[in-house]
């Protein structure tokens, strides 16, 4: 079938020329649209659409073969939820054009090797699975697929490689068997038994030190939190026991069996897994998230058991939909709800479990947290009669299991739940959670409710929270977000610095200059006078207190007023924060003023770091200071610390990028000079760039040193406070496992997990200076678990 447009003989030359150049592009775009949209809603059946599309592509192969190959390789990698549709299409094309089938298989192998070398291991899994399904479509011969699996499993015998490398190749084999296991066993049962025996032996000797640091819950009831390879192995074993029969994979190629079975098959070329290099970054291990079982969905279809391969297939397909459509929540929600096998399963329960599984995934979710929030809101809008009830049931389950829930996951639960409530008028039956009122405030349940209400207030206002939450919860109400000023009341007139604060207030109101402000502050006596020279130069806590308290009070009307005040008096802040003690005291005063308004503290500190009034290390030291111990387990404290670390990391990355860009510019100049020998000025042009590179290298080294120091400060403080707790418990005969200890230890885990890519650079330093063999095993285990993630 040809879709070329033929011009009339009377057409002028120029229009004809224009059409001739644009016509191939139009056809290529149409081919891409046809391939990408096949299998979507249509008046005709999938089978007839596939047959028609195969005819169109066959007719266009002479002119657009390379384009068609590129598109098919693209959809194999990036549209895995429609994999069997595309394998069927390739099967039909192979039956019509054997040479094209061979070229496609070769292109897929090239793509697979390139994808692995680029560390795109999730996409590589989809390519392996696609190749496996081509066995079902009679494109690839089963023996050559078995040979590829043998080479994959052979990686487990390699020496001096990280376990995560072997894990990935084993997972690639096991996760493909639901699609191709039956076909391979029919053709090569002895070889497949050997492969599975090798995998079993590998799994038995495999280290799983990382397991507990990745689990959402520490308790094994009601659902075990299994390591991903262990769970998949159990599912494959059950599938094998059931003679490789599964009921949830859409297999459109069965309708074309009479055509496909006549096609000639291709042998895969011998596949050697790309070797391990220093640049190889493998996926970290996972824990399989379980929230529901068949008892939770009493009506309608039964939920498959946790070790049935159907559960794996359903979850894998839903994960694929999320991966393909996460950028557009409406499309994503519609795709999830139109899941092909939805009538066979309790779909809403599966969707909610998969979404929460991704949201709570450690070290980090596949997508940004807010995506899951907006997606669940969209799903509730599309299914108002059923999905909100499942979501409420899930929320209740999560609440009841808070005592054993990982602190990082509790943070994400708080963020999601408060954001979700804000989109539904904050409606919730709070009385159902009244059991938290009889517990100590440091326990997970009352802490959770308090933090949710704090977040809800950020998304509304204080009085609204008091109106919607019963008065019985008053102990957990957020504080009225007003400031606390020492010098704002005449009853405090006897306080040191009060009279200066009054003068300073009037001066700022009258738009005094920095010089005038400095002259006023000069009159404040220094409590540390004896420690400094006679002029009182140096850290003066009272001077800082009077200035910062006064300024923040005058600028307390809004965030914008506070930002303007910081900008206007930036030079004064810089002068007061010259020393480390000065920086720390500024942070203490900010906390004293705004202790009832955590959000204000967070945004002010963010601004102060950006404007270099304080540095990241000062914020870290402040967080672990005794003054902050009452709020140490509060959510906002850790928001501030992680935000501080991220700012430091971005600063380093920015300078590194500048350095790389400059090096590339210099390399281009050298290349240009080499190609133009007559350019006598080119040597002189290199000079400024080389000097710039030298300066940037110094900046990178300085920034990395600052970054390393920040992590050293944080981990050192963690070790100190945890050690103090352990010693105190040991000497007092008290149980170590208090609510505070669980929270603190899991916050340490959180630092490692959320910033694991950066921390990896400083592992040797951390191991030599802080996490030594002499350290208490309660603390050292956290470091060892982190190391196991990439070992």
UniProtKB/Swiss-Prot annotation:
A Pfam entry, by short name: MIF4G_like
GO molecular-function terms, A-Z: mRNA binding; RNA cap binding
BP GO terms, sorted: 7-methylguanosine mRNA capping; mRNA export from nucleus; nuclear-transcribed mRNA catabolic process, nonsense-mediated decay; regulation of mRNA processing; regulation of translation; regulatory ncRNA-mediated gene silencing; RNA splicing
UniProt domain MIF4G: residue ranges: 28-240
Alphabetically ordered keywords of this record: Coiled coil, Cytoplasm, mRNA capping, mRNA processing, mRNA splicing, mRNA transport, Nonsense-mediated mRNA decay, Nucleus, RNA-binding, RNA-mediated gene silencing, Translation regulation, Transport
UniProt xrefs under SMART domains: MIF4G (SM00543)
Annotated coiled-coil segments of the chain: 641-714
Main location: nucleus
Region annotation Disordered: where it falls in the sequence: 1-24, 664-687
InterPro entries per the UniProt record, alphabetical: ARM-type_fold, CBP80, MIF4G-like_typ-1, MIF4G-like_typ-2, MIF4G-like_typ-3
Transmembrane spans: none
GO cellular-component term (any): nucleus
Disulphide bond pairs: none
Keyword Nucleus belongs to the record: yes
Compartments (UniProt record): Nucleus; Cytoplasm
Function text: Component of the cap-binding complex (CBC), which binds cotranscriptionally to the 5'-cap of pre-mRNAs and is involved in various processes such as pre-mRNA splicing, translation regulation, nonsense-mediated mRNA decay, RNA-mediated gene silencing (RNAi) by microRNAs (miRNAs) and mRNA export. The CBC complex is involved in mRNA export from the nucleus, leading to the recruitment of the mRNA export machinery to the 5'-end of mRNA and to mRNA export in a 5' to 3' direction through the nuclear pore.
Subunit-structure text: Component of the nuclear cap-binding complex (CBC), a heterodimer composed of ncbp1/cbp80 and ncbp2/cbp20 that interacts with m7GpppG-capped RNA. Component of an alternative nuclear cap-binding complex (CBC) composed of ncbp1/cbp80 and ncbp3.
Annotated family: Belongs to the NCBP1 family.
Protein name as it appears in the record: Nuclear cap-binding protein subunit 1-B
Species of the source: Xenopus laevis
């Amino acid at each position: 079938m040809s879709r070329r447009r033929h011009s009339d003989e009377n057409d002028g030359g120029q229009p004809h020329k224009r059409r001739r150049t644009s016509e191939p592009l139009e056809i290529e775009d149409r081919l891409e649209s046809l391939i990408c949209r096949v299998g979507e809603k249509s008046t005709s059946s999938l089978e007839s659409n596939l047959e028609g599309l195969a005819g169109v592509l066959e007719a266009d192969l002479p002119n657009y073969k390379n384009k068609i190959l590129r598109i098919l390789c693209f959809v194999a990698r990036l549209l895995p939820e429609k994999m069997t549709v595309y394998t069927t299409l390739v099967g039909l094309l192979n039956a019509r054009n054997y040479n094209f089938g061979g070229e496609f298989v070769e292109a897929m192998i090239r793509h697979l090797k390139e994808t692995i070398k680029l560390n795109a291991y999730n996409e590589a899994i989809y390519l392996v699975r696609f190749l496996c399904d081509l066995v079902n479509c009679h494109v690839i011969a089963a023996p050559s697929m078995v040979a590829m699996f043998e080479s994959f499993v052979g990686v487990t015998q390699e020496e001096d490689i990280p376990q995560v490398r072997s894990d990935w190749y084993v997972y690639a084999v096991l996760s493909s068997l639901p699609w191709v296991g039956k076909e391979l066993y029919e053709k090569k049962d002895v070889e497949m038994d050997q492969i599975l025996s090798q995998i079993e032996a590998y799994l038995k000797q495999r280290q799983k030190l990382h397991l507990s640091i990745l689990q959402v819950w520490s308790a094994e009831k009601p659902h075990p939190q299994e390591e991903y390879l262990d769970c998949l192995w159990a599912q494959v074993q059950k599938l094998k026991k059931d003679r490789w029969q599964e009921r949830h994979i859409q297999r459109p190629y069965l309708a074309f069996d009479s055509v496909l079975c006549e096609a000639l098959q291709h042998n895969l070329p011998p596949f050697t897994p790309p070797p391990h290099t220093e640049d190889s970054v493998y996926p970290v291990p996972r824990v399989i998230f379980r929230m529901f079982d068949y008892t939770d969905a009493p009506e309608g279809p039964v939920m498959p058991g946790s070790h049935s391969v159907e559960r794996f297939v359903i979850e894998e397909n839903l994960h694929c939909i999320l991966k393909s459509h996460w950028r557009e929540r409406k499309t994503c929600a519609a795709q999830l709800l139109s899941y092909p096998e939805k009538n066979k399963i309790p779909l809403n329960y599966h969707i909610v479990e998969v979404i929460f599984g991704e949201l709570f995934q450690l070290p980090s979710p596949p997508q940004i947290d807010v995506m899951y929030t907006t997606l669940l809101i969209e799903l509730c809008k599309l299914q108002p009669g059923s999905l909100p009830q499942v979501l409420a049931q899930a929320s209740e389950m999560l609440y009841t299991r808070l005592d054993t829930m990982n602190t990082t996951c509790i943070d994400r639960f708080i963020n999601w739940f408060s954001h979700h409530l804000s989109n539904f008028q904050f409606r919730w039956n709070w009385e159902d959670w009244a059991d938290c009122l009889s517990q100590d405030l440091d326990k997970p349940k009352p802490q959770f409710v308090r933090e949710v209400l704090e977040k809800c207030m950020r998304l509304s206002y204080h009085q609204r929270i008091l109106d919607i939450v019963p008065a019985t919860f008053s102990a957990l109400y957020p504080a009225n977000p007003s400031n606390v000023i020492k010098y704002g009341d005449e009853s405090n007139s006897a306080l040191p610095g009060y009279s200066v604060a009054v003068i300073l207030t009037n001066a700022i109101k009258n738009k005094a200059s920095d010089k005038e402000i400095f002259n006023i502050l000069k009159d404040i006596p220094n409590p540390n006078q004896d420690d400094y020279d006679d002029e009182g130069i140096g850290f003066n806590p009272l001077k800082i207190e009077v200035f910062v308290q006064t300024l923040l009070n005058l600028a307390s009307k809004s965030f914008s007023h506070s930002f303007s005040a910081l900008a206007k008096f930036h030079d004064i802040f810089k002068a007061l924060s010259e020393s480390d003690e000065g920086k720390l005291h500024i942070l203490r005063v900010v906390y004293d003023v705004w202790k009832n308004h955590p959000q204000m503290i967070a945004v002010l500190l963010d601004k102060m770091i950006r404007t270099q009034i304080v540095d990241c290390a000062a914020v870290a030291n402040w967080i672990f200071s005794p003054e902050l111990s009452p709020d140490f387990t509060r959510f906002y404290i850790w928001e501030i610390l992680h935000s501080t670390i991220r700012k430091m990391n971005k600063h380093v990355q920015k300078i590194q990028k500048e350095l790389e860009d400059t090096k590339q510019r210099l390399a281009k100049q050298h290349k240009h000079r080499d190609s133009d020998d007559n350019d006598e000025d080119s040597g002189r042009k290199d000079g400024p760039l080389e000097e710039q590179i030298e300066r940037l290298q110094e900046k990178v080294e300085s920034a990395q040193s600052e970054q390393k120091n920040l992590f050293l400060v944080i981990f050192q403080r963690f070790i100190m406070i945890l050690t103090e707790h352990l010693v105190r418990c040991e000497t007092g005969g008290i149980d170590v496992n208090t609510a505070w200890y669980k929270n603190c230890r899991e916050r340490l885990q959180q630092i490692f997990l959320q910033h694991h890519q950066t921390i990896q650079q400083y592992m040797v330093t951390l191991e030599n200076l802080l996490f030594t063999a002499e350290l208490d095993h309660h603390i050292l285990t956290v470091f060892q678990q982190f190391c196991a993630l990439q070992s």
